[in-house]
Structures are given as structure tokens and as C-alpha cells.
Amino acid sequence: IPATKQSWISDCWDAVRSIKKSNNYESMILVIDEIQKISNWSEAVKKEWDADTFNDCDIKVLLLGSSRVMLEKGLSESLAGRFEEIRMSHWSFLEMKECFDFSLEQYIYYGGYPGAASLINDNDRFSQYIQSAIIDATINKDILMDTPINKPALLRQTFELGASYSGELLSLNKMLGSLQDAGNTVTLAGYINLLNESGLLCGLQKFSIDNARRKASIPKLQVYNNALKMVYNSLS
């Protein structure tokens, strides 16, 4: 995909329309992978989609991408109400059991990333894969490429500390004391929100009928996949 050529989307769309018309097809499917690599892709998609809607041209569109943050930004900016979001995250236990013969204990500890399944007998290689292919790729390419971050090192430290304490209550004030150049709790809360949007780590608030008490409670940090915690915590 040409990252700077927005017209490429329109060219693809016109080609599909031409094929549909010349073959008298009732409908067609247009699939574009890694759509987030094109600047202002959502504007181009909105333009072509609205044109098809106006002209009653039945072209179904499937947009794929590897950057959740960048995709959601484009969807929320220009395509609100025009799409259905289907998230493809890590695999379920049944999928890992069927494909890799994972036991429940293995799934709980090693998580559900299929690319790392063959490495579970070598902890060093497994940790290196999760670190480079999942953590580094998400933070460096998903978050930092499209989001202005004043302290990138602090963002990474926040994730590492949160992953280490996954499943435990950890107040933002306590995190401030453990991180270098942490700034304030507002900064940390913003970084945790970014990590949540990218599918790495979230902060779960204590359940309460009272919304004020729930929001004021100390969050329980939780990784989305236990493989992310395993990198920072040895097996015990």
C-alpha cells in the first residue's frame, strides 16, 4: 500500500465498480489490508462509501489493519455509524487446545498467542518473542507512531510495572513512587488508558453501585493476556 497516495483507495474502488458493472454482479466485496498505512484513509473510504450509498451500488468493504489505535482513530473521526468493528485478539483456550494441544495450566501461564506456542519449552525464546513481536511492536508502532507522548520511556515503564503487578491492586500514587520522572497521576492514568486501547493492559475499578465510589477506588491492573505478565514474572 502506498502510504502517501490517498487516491490509491479510490482507484481500487473504481476497479471493483468496473468489474461489478461489466459482469452484472449483484454485489462484490472489496478487501484492503493494512489500511492504516495510508494517510487520511478514513476520509477516502467515507467518500467512496457515501458515493456507493447514493448510487445504490452494493459493494461490501472489509478493512483490515494491525494497529488498533490508528484504526479506531480513523473510524471515530470519519466513519461513525458506517461500520461494524470485529476485533481479532489472541486465541481462546479451545483454539489453543485444538491446534497446539495446550493444557489449561499452559494456557493460563503462556496465554493465547499462536505465534509463540511452539516456544513454550524455551522460556528465553518465548519471552523474547512476546517482548519483540507483541510488546515492542504495539508500543512503538501502534501507540508512539500516531500519539504524541511526552515521555515514551515512562509509558514503557508504566506497562512493565503494571504487567508485573497484574491481578493486584496498585494505586497511581504508589506507582508514582516506583517510576522515574513520573510526573503526576493524570499522566499515568492517560498512559494506562492508551495501553488499554492498544490491548495490552487495563485498570479494573472496584465494583460498586455508587459510581463515585467505583471511580475513586484503587484500580486492579490486568494484562489482556497472561503471556505479557510472564515476561516480567518467572514461573513459581
Per-range role (PLM):
Residues 1-26:
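Short glycine-rich substrate-engagement loop in P-loop NTPases that contacts/grips substrate
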Residues 9-10, 78-81, 219-221:
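Short, hinge-like loop/turn segments at secondary-structure boundaries
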Residues 24-45:
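Conserved P-loop NTPase "ATPase switch" module shared by AAA+ and STAND
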Residues 33, 45, 64, 96, ...:
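Conserved RecA-like P-loop NTPase ATPase core
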Residues 42-63:
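Conserved catalytic/switch belt of AAA+ P-loop NTPases
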Residues 44-47, 76-80, 236:
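Short, glycine/charged-enriched secondary-structure capping and boundary segments
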Residues 66-68, 72-169, 173:
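Interdomain motor-coupling "hinge/lid" segment immediately C-terminal to the ATP-binding subdomain
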Residues 127-236:
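Accessory nucleic acid-recognition modules appended to NTPase machines
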